[in-house]
């Protein structure tokens, strides 16, 4: 049976039903129908039955109307409700009036269908001009938005849409998950050997080791076997874990406890505190090396399968990374345009922290004046800062055109794998971490996000040496074959795929021909001036006496008795940094230096 009261309601309120804030939502239309008092029978149902049965009756009445006048009510199917649509998108008022006139003759004056449609479109597209209508619409909208969150409204469409929107915002793109899986299956691992946490094992081993020059030479297995009876599992633990054995010396006072500096102590032979030596059985080390090599071989085979290539070079599977490249230079006076553009830059400036350090430092003005903005059009930069220079580092990044997007903390651990809370780790307070600012320039689409965390837990090494884990983070962000630069680097910072510059490097090594050409032009323009940078070098020919000195010098060079070859023989590290310099090229360089010397 047709519910004529519902038909009358749809005719009288079709404009409000289709427009915001109701927007045709069935359950909101139902609520308006009930609250308007259009149907006494429905009100009776409301008092006697639950809301689900009421809404079912309302839906059945709509179905009866559609059966009587097809296409008079049209819905938009939504996936939130599987069994029925949830939204009315169109009401044919003309057809509904005809239907209502069947029950109440001549109640509505009928117009043409086209005029009815025009009336509907006009009402939907025309904005209310009167202030009262605007206020009414605003009040209805605020009423929809400001519902009581303590009341269970899970059945209302607006609550369902809100939950759906929140879930959609919380959902991470598939690219994040794929990038994380790619990093998991293609990143090579390093060997890991667990550390024994039983202090009694270290005490027993300290009485069974033979130490010479702060090195463990051998173990007395007879004593260890005797201790096995009272300490079951001791031998198995020795063969499967790392042990730190106390290095007891005549001057050691056990009551003082562990040294704050442990293996970094500068007075190791005279310090009265307890120090430790690391013991790893050779069989355990070999087994760990084999397992690591086998795992990395399997991982390298995964790299050859390009199952996800977003953010990587198109030839990632077959392309090999460039060998390590470096230039020894004074960064403050170097022309960064020689290097070109990079995707990732790491900078570890020697901030002036007002302490006696074994290396030179730069003042703030010099660091702020570095033209780092020339190195990237878009990309990411990692800037190491001290506690004093955090705000200065952020200001520098902003001046270079970067936005500070994150801050990574390096949690330092000592020889025993514990966090550092004492020792030479700060000026005013002992620092247990260091700060790394992350800056972003431009809007690079190729960065792989949400792979690593903003914490690095790693052991300290030489003074000012930073953890190697940062290189892995940078390569996973930008890709293995992206151009990467490290500024203020040293010999231990050079690595394949990276370009390193700094004044503590040994020699030069450049594989990129374009950079080599620009560097030669830069050096040529630089050597065309005197050491003061103002006086031009006189290009006159050397005198006869000067030529004799030069000839004698080259003879010594050819015989290998020159100072350069003597030093190179004593320090073979100097030889590996000149792969492009033939003997003739070396002569040309020394010839240039001699000309400069004899011209003065």
Curated annotation (Swiss-Prot):
Highest taxon in the source lineage: Eukaryota
E.C. numbers: 2.1.1.348
Consequence of gene loss (knockout): Severely decreases N6-methyladenosine (m6A) levels following meiotic induction. Increases the rate of degradation of KAR4 and MUM2 protein.
Keyword RNA-binding attached: yes
Mitochondrion among keywords: no
Sorted UniProt keywords: Cytoplasm, Meiosis, Methyltransferase, Nucleus, RNA-binding, S-adenosyl-L-methionine, Sporulation, Transferase
GO terms, biological process: meiotic cell cycle; meiotic DNA replication initiation; methylation; mRNA modification; negative regulation of pseudohyphal growth; sporulation resulting in formation of a cellular spore
Uppermost EC category: transferase
Induction, as annotated: In response to starvation conditions.
A single cellular component GO annotation: nucleolus
Stretches assigned to coiled coil: none
Catalytic activity: an adenosine in mRNA + S-adenosyl-L-methionine = an N(6)-methyladenosine in mRNA + S-adenosyl-L-homocysteine + H(+)
InterPro entries: MT-A70-like, SAM-dependent_MTases_sf
Effect on the protein of changing residue 351 to A: Impairs ability to sporulate
Annotated region (Disordered), positions in chain: 525-548
Main location: cytoplasm
Gene Ontology molecular function: mRNA m(6)A methyltransferase activity; RNA binding
Subunit description: Component of the MIS (mRNA N6-methyladenosine (m6A) methylation) complex, at least composed of IME4, KAR4, MUM2, SLZ1, and VIR1. Interacts with VIR1.
Protein family (similarity comment): Belongs to the MT-A70-like family.
UniProt-recorded name of the protein: N(6)-adenosine-methyltransferase IME4
Gene transcribed to yield this protein: IME4
């Amino acid at each position: 049976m047709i519910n004529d009261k519902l038909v009358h309601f749809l005719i009288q309120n079709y404009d409000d039903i289709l427009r915001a804030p109701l927007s045709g939502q069935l359950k909101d239309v139902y609520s308006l129908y009930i609250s308007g008092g259009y149907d006494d029978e429905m009100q009776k149902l409301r008092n006697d039955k639950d809301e689900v049965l009421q809404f079912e009756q309302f839906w059945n009445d709509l179905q009866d109307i559609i059966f009587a006048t097809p296409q008079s009510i049209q819905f938009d199917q939504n996936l939130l409700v599987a069994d029925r649509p949830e939204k009315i998108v169109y009401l044919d008022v003309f057809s509904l009036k005809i239907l209502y006139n069947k029950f109440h003759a001549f109640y509505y004056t009928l117009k043409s269908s086209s005029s009815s449609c025009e009336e509907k479109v006009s009402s939907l597209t025309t904005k209310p001009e009167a202030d009262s209508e605007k206020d009414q619409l605003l009040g209805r909208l605020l009423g929809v938005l400001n519902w009581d969150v303590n009341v269970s409204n899970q059945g209302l469409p607006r609550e369902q849409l809100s939950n759906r929107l929140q879930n959609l915002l919380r959902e991470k793109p598939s690219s994040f998950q794929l990038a994380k899986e790619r990093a998991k299956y293609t990143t090579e691992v390093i060997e890991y050997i667990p550390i024994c946490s039983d202090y009694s094992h270290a005490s027993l081993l300290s009485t069974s080791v033979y130490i010479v020059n702060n090195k463990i030479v051998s173990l007395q297995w007879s004593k260890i076997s005797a201790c096995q009876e009272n300490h079951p599992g001791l031998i198995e633990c020795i063969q499967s874990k790392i042990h730190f054995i106390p290095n007891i010396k005549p001057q050691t006072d056990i009551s003082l406890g562990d040294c704050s500096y442990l293996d970094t102590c500068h007075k190791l032979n005279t310090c009265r505190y307890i120090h430790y030596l690391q013991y790893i059985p050779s069989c355990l080390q070999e087994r760990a090396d084999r397992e690591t090599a086998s795992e990395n071989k399997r991982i390298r085979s995964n790299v050859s399968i390009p199952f996800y290539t977003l953010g990587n070079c198109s030839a990632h599977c077959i392309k090999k990374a460039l060998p390590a490249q470096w230039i020894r230079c004074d960064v403050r006076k170097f022309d960064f345009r020689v290097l070109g553009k990079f995707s990732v830059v790491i900078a570890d400036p020697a901030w002036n922290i007002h302490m006696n350090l074994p290396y030179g430092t730069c003042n703030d003005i010099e660091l702020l004046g570095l033209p780092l903005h020339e190195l990237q059009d878009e990309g990411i930069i990692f800037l190491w800062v001290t506690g004093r220079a955090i705000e200065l580092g952020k200001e520098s990044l902003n001046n270079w055109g970067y936005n500070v997007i994150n801050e990574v903390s390096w949690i330092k651990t000592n020889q025993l794998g514990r966090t550092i809370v004492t020792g030479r780790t700060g000026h005013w307070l002992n620092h247990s971490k260091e700060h790394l600012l992350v800056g972003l320039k431009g809007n690079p689409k190729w960065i792989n996000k949400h792979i690593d965390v903003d914490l690095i837990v790693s052991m300290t090494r030489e003074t000012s040496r930073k953890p190697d884990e940062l290189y892995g983070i940078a390569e996973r962000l930008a890709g293995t074959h992206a151009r990467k630069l490290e500024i203020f680097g040293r010999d231990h910072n050079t690595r394949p795929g990276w370009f390193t510059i700094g004044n503590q490097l040994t020699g030069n090594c450049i594989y990129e021909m374009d950079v080599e050409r620009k560097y030669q032009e830069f050096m040529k323009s630089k050597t065309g001036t005197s050491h003061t940078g103002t006086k031009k070098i006189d290009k006159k020919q050397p005198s006869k006496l000067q030529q004799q000195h030069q000839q004698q010098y080259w003879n010594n060079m050819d015989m290998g008795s020159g100072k350069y070859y003597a030093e190179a023989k004593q320090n073979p590290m100097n030889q590996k940094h000149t792969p492009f310099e033939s003997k003739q090229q070396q002569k040309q360089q020394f010839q240039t230096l001699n000309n400069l010397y004899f011209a003065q």
